């Protein structure tokens, strides 16, 4: 049921409510082309590919820029820290990959509930609900951030308990203390990001992130080298940079004409139905966390090897490069989530299915090219992070595994994006548990420790889990009944926009 201004469901505190206009990406043009059986198949596919490519790249290109620049901020912080010494590099790597990614995965995962609901609500033209979903998610993520703060505060004893060396654990905890403000930036940023993406508004975030990157680099240089603030200064600057992005994006939302229909001002509805929203957010969080924590465990296991500093340095450099390239796939992930959820919400099953095919092709080709580049530059990659010859040789030795990971990243994140667009988070979470934690991690530990293959063995085993997970998601996506998914999306929208559901939590 659509909510109206006076139905008691949504009582805005700011701004009048204008009449909505149909979203450009779901105007039915692509569905019409794909359904035109009188046109030869080749001509239909060519025209549909042109339409979808335009829609996709209008979403994906700015989204890739946003994710890559956000990741570059963390990557540059690690580079600044690494040039202080090998211990500082290991500490920043462990703090970033071992602690920060824990929070990042949880908060981004919970924010993905907004991606499903806002995307389908926008496609179904239930615009007034988007602002409510944004605010409700921010409330939930802020409460979650309070709990995560405890992990940051007690990061040193946690790392020691996990078997990390005292020197690295102590330095990493200092780095992590400066990242505490970043937790609450995540709580605001991820819902805002998904709110904008669901409306195909991505370019402003790209501009904001690009400008913030230059500010971040300047402030990092001042804090680390000129003011001598070391690891703590580097992480505090990273937190500040994330808050700059949050504030700038929110100012855009409340002042932009493009968000006039979806942002109706602050609403008390943000505090109702929290338990029902939490259950959906938790399913999204579990799905994504099981993925992000998987490679976090890879780095933690490397810290238990015979030469932990070398293993951490070499593996974390590879993971940083992988993560940077992964941001391209995450951009495609965001694009396909929006495309699928919008088309399902608008009742266009053929368009949703066609979008999945096109984005997988583009993402895979991009990542294969980058994997080839990585292999060609394997002997010089590490010198951007550290000057050590020993670390450089270790990184070069791991590059073939890095290339395989990049190719898998051309498919797997996109399939996860399809899952978010369709609302399959619970199913994917179960697949991730089986493939990652029942198969991948035990295999990695077996190869790395029992057979003494070290970091290469750990990584090889865990790649095996990723391969199985990718095949399962590809098979399920291939067999999807998209007409049925349209019906499920309609039911989901009716549930979440129903007046009684909004007022009374389940």
From Swiss-Prot:
List the keywords (alphabetical): Membrane, Transmembrane, Transmembrane helix, Transport, Vacuole
Mention any one GO cellular component term assigned to this protein in its UniProt record.
Answer: plant-type vacuole
**Bilayer topology:** Multi-pass membrane protein
Subcellular localization, as worded in the UniProt entry: Vacuole membrane
GO MF entries: antiporter activity; xenobiotic transmembrane transporter activity
Q: Does the keyword Acetylation apply?
A: no
Question: A Pfam family for this UniProt protein?
Answer: MatE
Chief location of this protein within or outside the cell: membrane
The UniProt entry's GO biological process terms, in alphabetical order, are: xenobiotic detoxification by transmembrane export across the plasma membrane
**Name used for this protein in its record:** Protein DETOXIFICATION 40
What is this organism's lineage? Eukaryota, Viridiplantae, Streptophyta, Embryophyta, Tracheophyta
